[in-house]
Amino acid sequence: MSKEYIGTDCYNRKMELYHIGNEVYCNHIKNGVVVKTNSITVDNRVLGLFGSPHTSGAYIYDEIARMYGKKL
């Protein structure tokens, strides 16, 4: 499991995206401590994006928001 840095949120917290099975998680990190974790169950279309060499975590985050209507 590798965590991918995808940017900062509106509260200036680092965001990391990763998955375990069909569950995608997004950690929000402030001062080195995870302060919030959101998750969503996704299908294989999204999981396939994690293995793509030219696909960024930010793109995956946006695709999840578009497909499922939920921001992590």
Descriptions of predicted regions:
Residues 1, 27, 59-62:
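Intrinsically disordered, low-complexity serine/threonine-rich segments
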Residues 1-4, 72:
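Short, Lys/Arg-enriched, disordered terminal segments
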Residues 4-29:
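Amphipathic, interaction-prone secondary-structure segments
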Residues 34-72:
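Mixed-charge, Lys/Arg-enriched low-complexity segments
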